[in-house]
Every structure is written in C-alpha cells, then in structure tokens.
C-alpha cells in the first residue's frame, strides 16, 4: 500500500517489501555536490542517506558546522572544568520506522560485526526498561500512582474530543483551550507533561498528534515499559557511529563554519539556492552554487543559546535571540519567501519555551542509598536503574530526575553515578532553596534534589558540597517546537518550487509525526534526500496504530483505568446501549470487543 507524498517523486510506504529493498543509483548523482548545514542528528542522517541510498561519493558531501564538535542537541561530554554534561536524553520506541531503517546500516562501535540497531535490540531484550517508582511526594515517598491515570469521565471525553479534532481546527490553539482541570488535575497529566515536557500553553495540535502517534503505548506510559534507551549517552551511542560511518565514506566535516544565509534566485515560482554565506573561523566567505548542488539546512534549534553553569555558578547570561546561530539563519532565509516558514512563531517568547536541566555526578557512596530506596535497583549495576524519569509530584519546580544505565559515559569512573535532573518551572522559588531554579548554582540544584530524595535537612548542604558535582544548563528554546502554530509556520521539508534546497529537523513540516523525537529528525532527513535526489524507494510511513481498532480499544480501556468505554454514563442514551449491542451478538465484532476487554459478561 502506497500513498503519494507532497515531495517530488517520493512516496510513503509500509511493510517489508520496500523496507528490505535497495534502490538503484539515482541518475546523475556523481555530478552533484551536497552541502549540509549543521551536524546534528538530522544533518548526519541526511549525509548517511546520501551515502547509502543516494550512492553519492562521500567526497561530494560537505557538512558545515559552526561548532568544533558534531551532534547538535545529541550531546554528552566530560568538561574538565565543570564535569559531566548531558543536556537531555533520548526516549525511543520500537516504531521509529525511519530511525531503525537508518541504524540497521550503521556499524556498531561496541559489537564487532553488528549494527547499531543490532546492539540496541539485544541490549533492550536482555535489559528491558520499566520503572518501579514513577513519582514521589513528601520528600522521597512513593506517590503510589500505581499505573493509574485517575481521569474522570469528563476528562476522558475531553481527550477523546481532542483526538477526533481536525488539525486545522487546532491551529494556534493551546492545550488550555481544549482541556480544563478535569485533565490538568489528573495523574495522566502528571505523566504526560513530565515525560514529554508539555506545558499548558503549548500547542493543542502537537498534543493531539502525540496522542495519535503513540496510541499504541498508552498502556506503557505509567511505567515507561514502552521506552527503550541506548547503552551510553546519545553522543557516544548514536552520533559517534554515524560520524565514523561518514568519515569512512570520505564525507568532509568542516567545523568552525557558521552559515549565516542561503541566497535564492526566485523566479516564476522556481526557487534555486545560488549561494551560501558563511564565516570560517570568523572570516566571512561564501560558496557559489549551481542547480546541481544540493543544500540541506537544519532550521531552528532547541539547544541554541544554551547557557552553562557549574557547581558554584548559576547559568546566567544573555538568553535573548542571538544575532548569529540557527534562528538567525532561518530568519534570513525566511525573509526571501513565505514558503520558508515563520521562525518568529517559535523563538519570540523564551518565558514559554525554556526549561533547565542539570547533570549531577555522585563522588562517593553517601547519596546512593536514597536513590536506591526510591528506584529499588542498584545504581551501579550497569543495568536499568530508574527506568525513566522519577517526578517529584509536589516539587515547586516540578523536578524530575533519571538515572540510565551506568556508566553513561564510556570512560566514566565505575564508582560514580551520573544523574540527569530537570525542572519544568524555572522561575518559581524552590521548596528547600528559596529561589528560582534559573538563579541557582549547581550545588543549590543538588540541594533541592536531595531534599526531594528525602535526605535529612541537616545533611543536605554537606552532601551537595562534598558528595556530588552538578552542571546546570539553561536552554531558552528547548520547547520552542511546542509553541502554538498554524499552517505555513513550519516550512515543508522541500518547500514548494525548490529545485535544490531542503529543510531538516524539528521545525519542518511532515504529516502525522511528532517533534522532540529522534525519529522526526531522521524522517525529515530521509524525505529531504529522497525528494531532492529522486531516490526510488518508499519512505516508511508513520506507524499506523491510530488506524488500528485493536490499539484504539486497548488504549480506551487503559485510559479509563480498566473500565470499559461501554460503562460510561451516556445519560438518556444509556437505554439504547443493550439493544445496539444485541445486534453484534455472535459476530466477529463481539469477539473483537471481548478479546480487548471492552465487552464484558452481562453487557449483552
């Protein structure tokens, strides 16, 4: 089954017929050059698809990166002046169709003869992810969410209504426009906003897309059994294998190269990228292009303008939109044609797009018993620890923290544990530290975290000073892609009329998929390469669980904490339920409803 895309000569597909097929070499590819702006996951994926499926010579592919390291938001470093730094983590699942299509071909750096996908698959089979404590309250006590969503019937109906709403009816609407306290006061909303970092003022459209995209994982939402994680941080587990693959293919990495604009010749609806303006180590220069040169640009960035603190300094600094960087580049491109999107919709209000994370590294054994009491696992076992975030339900910062398999860094001291902490509310005073998170040093953030672990108050300061080191990172635009939007605010991957230019990443438009995922980056890269180069192979469509009645039935029962949707009070319509159900007696519909626990004894 195939469905035509709005991308030149490309289409979506599903099933393994095309998944296992190799496309022929596109005509004329040896005469082309590709310039990729940025070296984050989307950019590296585009380069990999050019090599693997486009069969472009590696020496014809040029990656232009402003920094001196690849990876973009997929970072993970040891800074000798600060400590270990992870700005975020990557939650993945089995139906990231484009991501796994790519990583089946990227050799593992850890297991000889295996792919990154092989390594990841074996790891998560042998050490499956699940949480034993999803949330705490009263300073480290289990909040006993117990896998329940605690939604009222009215709350369930609000979610159902959003689920059924057309995209265009949600343009520029916020979550607050479609939900009320029936949802916001539920455990469902605690799970949802802490796991995905949604705020009440974010896009109702994106909320709906998330719900539809991951409907098959509703049952795994309370305990994170739906999730899978890499062995190490995302830089070492995902970025480095891709970089090695590309270097082996002869791809050129040009670091310290800041692209400031792409100049277009636009005539009669035809858009041709003619030049790239850039600075190489601060010196202005340019690249002249022909129609045979392909340009791929990652527009916007969730980690642009990150401000770093350390143990004794808060991440203070200018968090305004920079005159340089990804946002400025997109703005310069967007000025040339409306088809290139509206970056100001996403980067103009950092009070609504920021949050702060911190990496806490333990230095001895003193904090570990408090961690182990909550997660009920040995943090230094090398296996799953928290199994996803633990949210401090009554935290003023809405603090959450997680410990993935240790060490999170390949060269990490085996006696140390790296903890990732983040707070959704950065501008309100804490519960132990009486000032906003954004004004806190690393030590003070550790103190607030220790308070919510249940450490005795008279020990907190000493442990934060001597038993841990913390690196806070303030990210002004981390949820910029969640801001309310309308059609055209995000440009198409290949904007209408573009001959040799495509956008990549989280701020492009592609149907049905959801931002803030590794899959979105890789999907847009695949669509861009296949569309511009004419790769004759289908792009895997977004997993179609939203169209699978079995998944819809299962998720409905789960969302209602085990009650059947048929048990809902429909008022005057209650009297017709039994007669209508009698019509399906003895049919495959009855069997389907019984198999998925919707139809129960006594209902017919």
Regions from the PLM with identified roles:
Residues 51-78:
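Glycine-rich FAD pyrophosphate-binding loop
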Residues 81-122:
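Conserved FAD-binding subdomain of flavin-dependent enzymes
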Residues 215-230, 292-294, 299-524, 530-544:
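C-terminal segments that line or cap access tunnels to active or ligand-binding sites in enzymes
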Residues 531-590:
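Active-site-proximal substrate-binding core of FAD-dependent oxidoreductases
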Residues 26-42, 62:
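Beta1/beta-strand and adjacent pyrophosphate-binding region of the FAD-binding site
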Residues 212-294, 299-300, 312, 318-327:
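Helical element adjacent to the flavin cofactor pocket in flavoenzyme catalytic cores
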Residues 2-7:
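Short, small-residue-biased leader/transition segments that mark boundaries at the very start
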Residues 109-216, 228-229:
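Rossmann-like flavin
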């Amino acid at each position: 089954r195939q469905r035509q895309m709005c991308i030149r000569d490309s289409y979506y597909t599903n099933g393994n017929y095309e998944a296992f097929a190799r496309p022929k070499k596109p005509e004329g590819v040896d005469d082309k050059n590709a310039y990729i702006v940025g070296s984050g996951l989307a950019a590296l994926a585009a380069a990999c698809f050019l090599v693997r499926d486009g069969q472009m010579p590696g020496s014809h592919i040029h990656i232009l990166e402003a920094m001196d390291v690849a990876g973009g938001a997929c970072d993970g470093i040891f800074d000798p002046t600060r400590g270990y730094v992870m700005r975020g983590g990557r939650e993945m699942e089995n139906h990231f169709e484009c991501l796994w299509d790519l990583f089946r071909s990227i050799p593992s750096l850890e297991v000889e003869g295996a792919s990154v996908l092989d390594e990841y698959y074996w790891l998560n089979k042998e050490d499956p992810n699940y949480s034993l404590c999803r949330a705490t309250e009263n300073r480290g006590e289990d909040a006993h969410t117990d896998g329940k969503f605690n939604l009222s019937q009215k709350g369930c109906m609000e979610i159902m209504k959003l689920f059924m709403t057309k995209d265009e009816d949600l343009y520029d609407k916020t979550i607050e426009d479609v939900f009320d306290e029936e949802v916001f006061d539920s455990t469902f909303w605690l799970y949802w906003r802490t796991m995905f970092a949604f705020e009440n003022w974010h896009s109702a459209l994106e909320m709906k897309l998330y719900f539809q995209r991951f409907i098959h994982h509703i049952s795994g939402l309370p305990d994170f059994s739906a999730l899978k994680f890499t062995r190490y941080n995302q830089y070492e587990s995902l970025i480095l294998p891709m970089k090695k693959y590309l270097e082996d293919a002869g791809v050129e990495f040009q670091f310290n190269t800041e692209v400031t604009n792409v100049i277009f010749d636009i005539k009669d609806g035809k858009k041709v990228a003619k030049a790239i303006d850039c600075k190489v180590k601060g010196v202005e220069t340019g690249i002249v292009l022909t129609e045979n040169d392909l340009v791929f640009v990652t527009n916007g960035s969730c980690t642009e303008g990150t401000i770093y603190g350390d143990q004794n300094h808060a991440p203070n600094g200018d968090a305004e939109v920079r005159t340089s960087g990804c946002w400025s580049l997109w703005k310069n491109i967007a000025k040339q044609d409306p088809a290139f999107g509206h970056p100001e919709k996403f980067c103009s209000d950092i009070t609504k797009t920021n949050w702060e994370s911190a990496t806490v590294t333990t230095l001895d054994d003193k904090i570990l018993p408090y961690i182990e009491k909550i997660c009920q696992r040995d943090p230094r076992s090398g296996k799953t620890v928290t199994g996803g975030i633990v949210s401090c339900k009554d935290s003023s910062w809405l603090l959450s923290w997680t410990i993935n398999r240790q060490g999170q860094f390949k060269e990490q001291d085996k006696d140390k544990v790296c903890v990732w902490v983040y707070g959704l509310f950065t501008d309100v005073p804490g519960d132990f530290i009486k000032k906003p998170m954004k004004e806190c040093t690393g030590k003070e953030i550790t103190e607030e975290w220790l308070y919510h672990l249940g450490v005795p108050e008279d020990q907190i300061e000493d442990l934060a000073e001597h038993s841990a080191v913390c690196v806070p990172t303030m990210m002004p635009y981390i949820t910029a892609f969640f801001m309310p939007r309308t059609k055209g605010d995000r440009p198409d991957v290949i904007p209408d009329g573009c001959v040799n230019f495509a956008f990549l990443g989280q701020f492009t438009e592609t149907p049905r998929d959801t931002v803030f995922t590794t899959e979105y980056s890789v999907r847009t890269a695949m669509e861009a390469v296949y569309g511009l180069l004419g790769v004759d192979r289908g792009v895997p469509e977004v997993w179609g669980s939203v169209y699978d009645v079995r998944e819809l039935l299962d998720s409905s029962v789960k969302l209602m904490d085990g009650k059947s949707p048929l048990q809902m009070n429909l008022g005057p319509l209650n009297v017709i339920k039994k007669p209508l159900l009698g019509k399906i007696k003895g049919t495959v519909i009855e069997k389907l409803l019984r198999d998925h626990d919707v139809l129960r004894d006594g209902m017919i």
